[in-house]
Swiss-Prot record:
Pfam families: HMG_box, Sox_N. Keywords: Cytoplasm, DNA-binding, Nucleus, Transcription, Transcription regulation. Residues 30-42, 441-461 have a biased composition (Polar residues). The transactivation domains TAM and TAC (for transactivation domain in the middle and at the C-terminus, respectively) are required to contact transcriptional coactivators and basal transcriptional machinery components and thereby induce gene transactivation. Residues 56-96 are annotated as: Dimerization (DIM). It comes from Gallus gallus. InterPro entries: HMG_box_dom, HMG_box_dom_sf, Sox_N, SOX_TF. This is Transcription factor SOX-10. Residues 1-60, 154-191, 205-268, 350-369, 433-461 are annotated as: Disordered.
Length: 461
């Protein structure tokens, strides 16, 4: 009875044998255990012998002090509190896994592998498998027939033994994980791109509709895809244009070839409100260089009332839209003294409002871009060279001196562009049509117009 009790303790306790091994891990312990094993059953003998071998191997690895410390820590531990692992698929020992019946190749490979492994014990298993596959492909039907018949016999026997068997392949976890990671990565990239586009769109919308009284939000919706005002964008437009502007144009339902750039009203925008991303995308310019030409904390002169663009014919060159666009209001080919002559240019300017983040080469067919010249006040000869193809039938320039309301003084230039300041309705003058005082220079899309501007100070008459 004492021997059986000792054996049960050795089986149940994971450290039961370590107390004996701590002090004497020599052959004496093996002789003691052999006396116990002689009186035990065959099943218990194999199990205890395995535990004995494992414990002896562990004893050889660690010194006596380490084994004593481990035994002291684990002596009072209750192993019944350790949770048993639960299989996810629900299979347990009462329901063992049923293997698939072997096909003809597996019958051949199993028999040939055993024979070749006995003949060539040094042969690697992978090389053996490749050789078996090559040999199977070289066999003819007569050679394969015995293996096919054996596989059919095994299949029928398997069907009798397991009538309810249904093949359920195990899903590969790594393939599923990689697929999920790929989907998550795609979603992450799409979400990042969408967030960037949404950020730029919000920035454009904030500039485009700063208030209900702004010229563009006063009862005039954005252009639909069918409305195309103004000249189309030439094919030489640089590729440095903001991609967010392209996305906005597509979302608004109008192609890029019609408008070219999203509408932004700078009439009520302070320089502090311009997002840093838009400013930093102008690669050709130095952002810090702009600040010395801008007024400190100004707000643009706000036009009092815009009833409609038919009534908005009163918009002169100093109106908010014409000044924000910086061009189309000068392109009128009509000769007239009344302000109604500027109706179509102002409507054109609505379609051709430039973004501040647009590239310096984003010019149109009628004249080159004025991105950098727009930040300074220029005398009339330089103005004539910068806008070569403009006929000026509506403006009065006495003695090459710009009129006061057209180039307002720097103290009044509180908008974003000091050269083309935004004027209220009370500041809009009537321009008489005279001949062009400055010789017209042939139009050129070369970058010389914005790389070397001439900065001059204008005096108000």
């Amino acid at each position: 009875m004492a021997d059986d009790q000792d054996l049960s303790e050795v089986e149940m306790s994971p450290v039961g044998s370590e107390d004996h091994h701590c002090l004497s891990p020599g052959p004496s312990m093996a002789s003691d255990n052999s006396s116990h094993l002689a009186s035990s059953g065959n099943g218990e003998m194999g199990k205890v012998k395995k535990e004995q071998q494992d414990s002896e191997a562990d004893d050889d690895k660690f010194p006596v002090c380490i084994r004593e410390a481990v035994s002291q820590v684990l002596s009072g531990y209750d192993w019944t509190l350790v949770p048993m692992p639960v299989r996810v698929n629900g299979s347990n020992k009462s329901k063992p896994h049923v293997k698939r019946p072997m096909n003809a190749f597996m019958v051949w490979a199993q028999a040939a592998r055993r024979k070749l492994a006995d003949q060539y014990p040094h042969l690697h298993n992978a090389e053996l498998s490749k050789t078996l596959g090559k040999l199977w492909r070289l066999l003819n039907e007569s050679d394969k027939r015995p293996f096919i018949e054996e596989a059919e016999r095994l299949r029928m026997q398997h069907k009798k033994d397991h009538p309810d068997y249904k093949y359920q392949p195990r899903r590969r976890k790594n393939g599923k994980a990689t697929q999920g990671e790929g989907e998550g990565q795609v979603e992450g990239e799409a979400g990042g791109a969408a967030s960037i586009q949404a950020h730029y769109k919000n920035a454009h919308l904030d500039h485009r509709h700063p208030g209900e009284g702004s010229p563009m939000s006063d009862g005039h919706p954005e252009h639909s895809s069918g409305q195309s005002h103004g000249p189309p964008t030439p094919p030489t437009t640089p590729k440095t244009e903001l991609q967010a502007g392209k996305a906005d144009s597509k979302r608004e339902g109008r192609s890029l070839g019609e408008g070219g750039k999203p509408h932004i009203d700078f009439g009520n925008v302070d320089i502090g409100e311009i997002s840093h991303e838009v400013m930093s995308n102008m690669e050709t310019f130095d952002v810090n260089e702009f600040d010395q030409y801008l007024p400190p904390n100004g707000h643009a002169g706000h036009p009092g009332h815009v009833g409609g663009y038919a009534a908005a014919a009163g918009y002169g060159l100093g109106s908010a839209l014409a000044a924000a666009s910086g061009h189309s209001a000068w392109i009128s080919k009509q000769h007239g003294v009344s302000l109604s002559a500027t109706t179509s240019p102002v409507v054109d300017s609505k379609a051709q409002v430039k973004t501040e983040g647009s590239a310096p080469g984003g010019h149109y067919t009628d004249q080159p871009s004025t991105s950098q010249i727009a930040y300074t006040s220029l005398s009339l000869p330089h103005y004539g060279s910068a806008f070569p193809s403009i006929s000026r039938p509506q403006f009065d320039y006495p003695d090459h001196q710009p009129s006061g309301p057209y180039y307002s003084h720097s103290s009044q230039a509180s908008g974003l562009y000091s050269a083309f300041s935004y004027m209220g309705p009370s500041q809009r003058p009537l321009y008489t049509a005279i001949s062009d005082p400055a010789p017209s220079v042939p139009q050129s899309h070369s970058p010389t117009h914005w790389e070397q501007p001439v900065y001059t100070t204008l005096s108000r008459p």
